[in-house]
Curated annotation (Swiss-Prot):
It comes from Ureaplasma parvum serovar 3 (strain ATCC 700970). It is found in: Membrane. The keyword Magnesium does not apply. The lineage of its organism: Bacteria, Bacillati, Mycoplasmatota, Mycoplasmoidales, Mycoplasmoidaceae. NCBIfam families: mycoplas_M_dom, predic_Ig_block. Keywords: Membrane, Transmembrane, Transmembrane helix. Residues 56-76, 98-124 have a biased composition (Basic and acidic residues). Signal peptide: none annotated. This is Uncharacterized protein UU046. Residues 56-175 are annotated as: Disordered. GO terms for cellular component: membrane. It comes from the Bacteria. Residues 77-97, 125-139 have a biased composition (Pro residues).
Amino acid sequence: MKFIKRKTKLLTITIGAVAVSSILLGGIFYGTSQKSPSSFGIASIDQKENFINKDNLDYQKARPSIKDNNLKEIPKPKPQPKPEPQPTPFPDPIPTPPKKEELKKPEIKPEEPKKPEIKPEPIPKPKPQPIPQPTPPVETKPKEELLPPSPPPPKEEPKPEPDPQPQPQQIPNQSTVRKIELNGVLVDAEVEVPPPRQTFKYDQDNGLSNLNPYTNISVGKIKKVFVTDELRHKSADLVRGNLKRGDYQSLVKDLLDPNIKPEEIDSYIAMVDKSGYHAKLWSKFKKLFDTDNVVNFLNEQGKKEYPNMKTKFVSDAHKYAWLYAHLDFSKFTKLSANSEKYLQEGLTPDPDNSYVNENGELDSYAYSPAKEYNTVTSRLANDNANRRVFGYNEWYNRSPNGLANGDYPGWNKSDATAEFKQYGIKDGDGIKVYKLERQKPQEGKLNTGYIVDIDADNPDGYQKTKELIQKLNNQNKKITGYRIRNMGKSDSGQKFSDILKALPNELPLLELFFSAGSHNTSALSALETKHIKELGLYTLGNSLLDEWSINPNALRKVEWINSNDYNVSSEYKQGSDIATRITFDTLSFDKNDFNDNANDLRTKLKRINDGLRMVYWTRNNEPFFQGGFGPGLDPDHKEVGNSYPQGLDFSRVPQIRSLRGLIFKDEQKASNNRERKLRRVNFFNDKENYEMSINDLNEAGFSEHIVTNEPMPPKSKITFSNGNATKRIYIKGNGSLTASGIQNLATLFNLAESLDSKSVVVDSNNSELKSQLEGLGYKVSDASDANYIDI
């Protein structure tokens, strides 16, 4: 037994030794040999799945796993440069710090002198190239830097400009980066400087251009603003301040007065608010008040009470008043996306038109440009400072009283009639002389002037006016201006032509006040040879009537026809005398404008067509020549977008029987590619029959040049100087009507309301025309019939 135990023990030791040595040898071999790619490893199951979806992984050292752990990408030399293009991104309106420094460089100090530059200064005497004076070379650099973020604007703008035929005169708009002020905050902005206005030799040769070229928009156009948080906060503050105005709070407090029951609020508003003031207040909050989101903008008390109050509101007014009274205005801090968009365009929310949207964000129904880039107020200010003879440095116009009394802001007026007694002026003759002195004299400007004021309704003054003017001229007495009031008040046929002819050929100021009942402006033709700096045409009556007409040829040498002093408003008491400038929406001509001695129609009509061209195109950037609807978006360069007078009056030109030969297109500038169209035409006639030749009718242009088939009133019309006495159309001559002539005749009957339905007279020997017209459904009469002979 001992032997067996000993043998077993030896065998166990031997086997153990062999096993240990095998393990040791295997470990040594494994440690010294290269690792197999199929070897096992231990991976933590705590890690998240990590699948690497790439085709450049190194699988040489991969371990079997359901995850792509511990895999490395095969290094490539090329990926390194890829981050390099990243510096190009420039899309954000708010530049990143490095880019901001780049933008600042162009505008460093070249643009700081902008304030003295103010833009009105170049306008008074801009000659051909006022605007791009100081900085052409400097502005080129920023233009190249700014184009990448917004390529469309610079590239699209020049496209329409090349259309005009004149060679390199049309310079593309240039952009520059400069500091501008919005809501009292200085920010960087890309500003487009407009090119000088295009001029044409034809206009200069024919006396159609303004002797002192006019610029409507003298300020640059903001293309993009780099919005800052400071600007956002300031804009939000201004809007928020308006939303919680004291008068709004008083309105709401009154509605929630314990003495007014909730169900009585609507009737109370109807009784006390005739102007819709409450409705205006509700419109500012309605979008938010009509959503449950409003609870997030209530004060603590409002939040607690709102769930219970929701069921107790008896009307919108009750609900809105309660919600307004419980608002926490400090929570209105964010501008809407709409406001952000407009800020980037240089437009700030107008506080008075502001509102809160359904998200509690601040928005507005109207937006205002930066003060110095407001094209309307800058034009008015420039005209007041540089076009007015007695100028002042504000954008607002003269009040009705100031206009009627001859007063000007910033000027002192005194009676100086005694100094002119030797010229025959007497007490009671309606003639006064006033001295005007600037309160703060300006170097290089008129600081003292004399105005002769004449009341044309005074027979004594009217009779001696011409003589007085001649005496003052002969003795070289410096008169700055003449004011003639009450023209045509007692006698609409009062003659002023001789008085106006007697005026000096060089006159700074002429103001004419037409009576409300007299629209006769034919005497103004006497001004054609007078060089006048400022002409004011005013009335105390209705200044918007279609009957107000003017011969444009009378204005050829007038530098500025005052259009600023516009005092038309529904706020004025009906029937009261309100002095205002007249809006002329009708052009008229005189007999001598038609050249009877010329051999061809174009030459016969040259003065008339030149007058039309001056108004429709050459000087159409001036407000006076834009009729009743004002300028387009680019009045100096895209005249086709401007308004214009839409009436023609030929009642003083008997030779004109239709629109034949009249030119309504711009023959000099191809980009003005739409013709002007009319809504009113008045022809001379003193008979029952309106006589026209076949050529006049075939080429009448009625269907081509008059607005027809428009649903919106008023309807276009053709009238005659004898009113409704014109009953028939008499077509004279041999031959028949062309297709155009047939259409023109139909248009004539459609628009001339005085005509008897389709009643036409033809010459007795023109059977061809008679048959043609009868076939078209007209009632045709023979001119030899005694019933149709005009005596």
